[in-house]
Amino acid sequence: MNEKKNLLNGYIVSNKMNKSAVVIVERKIKHSIYKKFIKKRTKLCIHDEKNICNIGDIVTIRECRPISKTKSWILVNILEKSIV
């Protein structure tokens, strides 16, 4: 039961929900024909137990068991606070 869970970095785009936030995770993939790198984005709902995230923060998130219908990621730490 001590397997390594997925860790991702992203930035907060919404924190209007109680104990929740929305994170955008960007990744680069290489196009199979044109060999050009393309940015892909994924929106993930995360669990923020202490409501410490603000919009623009760069965070690390970890995969966990499903907490609700859309939340299956939790906040690990905040890498950089936003200047708002």
Swiss-Prot record:
Coiled-coil blocks: none
Keyword list (alphabetical) reads:
Ribonucleoprotein, Ribosomal protein, RNA-binding, rRNA-binding
One Pfam family cited in the UniProt record for this chain: Ribosomal_S17
GO biological-process terms attached to the record: translation
Can you tell which superkingdom this protein's organism belongs to?
Bacteria
The record ties this protein, via InterPro entries, to:
NA-bd_OB-fold, Ribosomal_uS17, Ribosomal_uS17_bact/chlr, Ribosomal_uS17_CS
Query: What cellular component terms from Gene Ontology apply here?
Result: cytosolic small ribosomal subunit
Q: Which GO terms describe its molecular function?
A: rRNA binding; structural constituent of ribosome
Q: Which family does it belong to?
A: Belongs to the universal ribosomal protein uS17 family.
Q: What does this protein do?
A: One of the primary rRNA binding proteins, it binds specifically to the 5'-end of 16S ribosomal RNA.
Please name the NCBIfam families in this protein's record: PRK05610.1, uS17_bact
Please describe the quaternary structure of this protein.
Part of the 30S ribosomal subunit.
- Protein name as annotated: Small ribosomal subunit protein uS17
